[in-house]
From Swiss-Prot:
Source organism per UniProt: Emericella nidulans (strain FGSC A4 / ATCC 38163 / CBS 112.46 / NRRL 194 / M139)
Name assigned to this protein: 1,4-alpha-glucan-branching enzyme
Catalytic reaction equation(s): Transfers a segment of a (1->4)-alpha-D-glucan chain to a primary hydroxy group in a similar glucan chain
UniProt KW keywords: Cytoplasm, Glycogen biosynthesis, Glycosyltransferase, Transferase
PANTHER family: 1,4-ALPHA-GLUCAN-BRANCHING ENZYME
Function: Glycogen-branching enzyme participates in the glycogen biosynthetic process along with glycogenin and glycogen synthase. Generates alpha-1,6-glucosidic branches from alpha-1,4-linked glucose chains, to increase solubility of the glycogen polymer.
UniProt site (Transition state stabilizer): D464
Example of a GO cellular component annotation carried by this entry: cytoplasm
Lineage: Eukaryota, Fungi, Dikarya, Ascomycota, Pezizomycotina
């Protein structure tokens, strides 16, 4: 942001003059965020203090062992703290209320020891205005546990381990990567066994695998506590509790710290777009009213997700959500967030039954939820002020302009957005088109169709495509032959040959052309067979598909290891040449007849031959920089399960003659269904 940029939030218009007709709407949006920042400054002493709500609310223990517990519940007319410590006596520990509906109780220590034992059950009980006595899990609780032998309903526990049992972080956060290469993972499925895997197993088994593959970021799903395992973590009950299914809070801290020791940043998949509608172990109807943290009536219900919608324009809701982000950064050492369901937060229609044409009126009209936009801008402003290296990623299908520009320019402040159109394109191609009918121009357009100056994370597939009812790319490509012909002892059938070739090419073209970051969902890097289906009534609570068969890459008689090694080579080559943080590619050729795509990015020359049957000898390719080129990545390499049709030692010499708008050309042999990345010899 330059010093000459306007300070009224209209700087984005200088970057994109097509936004000029919406100047007033942009300025109004900016002013609304500024008014909230001013309110927080005046009333709360600034975003720093405001986002530390967990130091005031919930349970806090002093150095001397005194406990203070506070809860916002304005609809309650009585409140008391109950638990194992007082035999659930509703009269033993009454709470007092202030003028803002905040209930409080102080419990002095006995002989320097907290009166509530560590890991013992607690709840708040309230009497509502209708006279009903209710029991609730504290909203800011840091640990809840579930015993399915007793009930599916979670129980809240007072978590205050002795100092000797607390995890002490040993390693500093790594610097924010210039090129973000994300490995998306779910702790519970990270094992070939038919059970829930643990934080400790992830630390021991998955972190070395992710590091070996060359990723520099991990995105952890389903960490915020959720009662329904099959929700994939997207129906959150307890926002400050790390899921107890996988182990203790200390185990998650060890996971993050160990990742940091390996140079890996860790992002939390944060769900602030909605909340579980559970009453007994969630936030819903917390104080007996339907409008405490959420909008009342139908406005507070998400009809597709069957969940509750936050009221982002409420002061205490903002405190709760901003403090939640801060808590995960401070308590667990996360390095940033992937915000789930951002489209639902940005619009009052929540994206339901609404397509986006890309017309700017859709982003600045009456359908925009001003409070949702304000909260996201405030969240990004707080995070980036306090943690300059914090990484935020938005999951938005609408394509809202300025989502990934700073608030000062009039943006919402995210670092990256997910390129959600890319995986949809691949599924459409594989479902509906024969290989001869692939539209190379449309492929290139979809991969490069992103807003200038706003960073995008490209991916060929994520967890969405792995879920039951959908198929991973490898399943679309190979189908039932995955079960019979992925052994090197069986015939290399045309189906498997095509599947492996396109699996590598699709990933490489996405990585090289599609964005400023790259994401892969665990297992998909090696073509994991089958889909994901969590234990539920519809499958007899089976874990058979709720696991990742990561052992498949360790069997040298299976072809999965070739895809795994290719993925590693792709990440390591990016690490060396840095195309993800280089300017967008220059595309010099999109040949529909030959099915050839050629482009340059980060001083590498990329050549893709998607033709299903034709190989080309001495194919002339334009290139800007003169010199001698060598192969740095070849999808047909035998090390990656290819046919090895290209001599890796070949030197390609440029000719000083313009070709396809480039100053020079060179000639290459490009076999069918093969992609090459060439680099100048002196960079090897």
């Amino acid at each position: 942001m330059t010093s000459t940029a306007p300070s009224d939030g209209t700087g984005i218009i200088d970057l994109d003059p097509w936004l000029e007709p919406f100047r007033e709407a942009i300025k109004r949006r900016f002013d609304y965020v500024e008014s909230w920042i001013k309110t927080v400054d005046e009333v709360e002493g600034g975003l720093d203090k405001f986002s530390k709500g967990y130091e005031k609310f919930g349970f806090n223990v002093s150095e001397t062992g005194d406990i203070t517990y506070r809860e916002w519940a304005p609809n309650a007319i009585e409140a008391a703290l109950v638990g194992d410590f007082n035999n659930w006596d509703t009269k033993a520990n009454p709470m007092t209320r202030d003028n803002f509906g905040v209930w409080e109780i102080a419990l002095p220590a006995k002989n320097g020891t907290p009166v509530i034992p560590h890991d013992s059950k607690v709840k708040i009980t309230m009497v509502t205005r209708s006279g009903e006595r209710i029991y609730r899990i504290p909203a800011w609780i840091k640990r809840v546990v579930q015993d399915l032998n007793v009930s599916p309903i979670y129980e809240s526990v007072f978590w205050n381990p002795p100092k000797a049992e607390r995890y002490n972080f040993q390693h500093a956060r790594p610097k924010k990567p210039e090129s973000l290469r994300i490995y998306e993972a779910h702790v519970g499925i990270s094992s070939p066994d038919t059970r829930v895997a643990t934080y400790k197993e992830f630390t021991a088994n998955m972190l070395p695998r992710i590091k070996y593959l060359g990723y520099n970021a991990i995105q952890l799903m389903a960490i915020m506590e959720h009662a329904y395992y099959a929700s994939f973590g997207y129906q959150v009950n307890n926002f400050f509790a790390a899921s107890s299914r996988y182990g203790k809070p200390e185990d998650l801290k060890e996971l993050v710290d160990t990742a940091h020791s390996m140079g890996l940043v860790v992002l939390l998949d944060v769900v602030h777009s909605h909340a579980s509608k559970n009453v007994d172990d969630g936030l819903n109807m917390f104080d007996g009213s339907d409008h405490l943290y959420f909008h009342s009536g139908s406005k507070g219900q998400h009809e597709l997700w069957d969940s509750r919608l936050f009221n982002y324009g409420n002061h205490e809701v903002l405190r709760f959500l901003l403090s939640n982000l801060r808590f995960w950064m401070e308590e667990y050492g996360f390095d940033g967030f992937r915000f789930d369901g951002v489209t639902s937060m940005l619009y009052t229609h929540h994206g339901i039954g609404t397509g986006f044409s890309g017309g700017y009126h859709e982003y600045f009209g009456p359908a925009v939820d001003d409070d949702g936009v304000m909260y996201l801008a405030l969240a990004n402003e707080m995070l980036h002020r306090l943690y300059p290296d914090c990484i935020t990623v938005a999951e938005d299908v609408s394509g809202m302009p300025a989502l990934c520009l700073p608030h000062g320019l009039g943006g919402v402040g995210f670092d990256y957005r997910l390129a959600m159109a890319i995986p949809d394109m691949y599924i459409k191609l594989l479902k509906e088109k024969s290989d001869n009918d692939w539209d190379i121009g449309n492929l290139a357009f979809t991969l490069t169709n992103r807003r200038h100056g706003e960073k995008t994370i490209a991916y060929a597939e994520s967890h969405d495509q792995a879920l039951v009812g959908d198929k991973s790319l490898m399943m679309w490509l190979c189908d039932k032959e995955m079960y019979t012909h992925m052994s090197v002892l069986t015939e290399f059938t045309p189906v498997i040959e095509r599947g492996m070739a396109l699996h590598k090419m699709i990933r490489l073209v996405t990585h090289a052309l599609g964005g400023e970051g790259y994401l892969n969902f665990e297992g998909n890097e090696f073509g994991h067979p089958e889909w994901l289906d969590f234990p539920r009534a519809g499958n007899n609570n089976s874990f058979w598909y709720a696991r990742r068969q990561l052992n498949l890459t360790e069997d040298h008689l299976l072809r999965y290891r070739f895809l795994n090694e290719f993925d590693r080579a792709m990440q390591l080559t990016e690490s060396k040449y840095g195309w993800l943080h280089a300017p967008q590619a220059y595309i010099s050729l999109k040949h529909e007849g030959d099915k050839v795509l050629v482009f340059e990015r980060a001083d590498l020359l990329w050549i893709f031959n998607f033709h299903p049957t034709e190989s080309f000898t001495d194919y002339r390719v334009g290139v800007e920089q003169a010199g001698t080129y060598r192969v740095v990545l070849d999808t047909d390499d035998q090390a990656f399960g290819g046919l090895g049709r290209i001599d890796q030692g070949t030197r390609f010499f440029t000719t000083d003659m313009e070709w396809n708008g480039r100053r020079n050309y060179l000639q290459v042999y490009i076999p069918t269904r093969t992609a090459l990345a060439l680099a100048l010899e002196e960079t090897l």
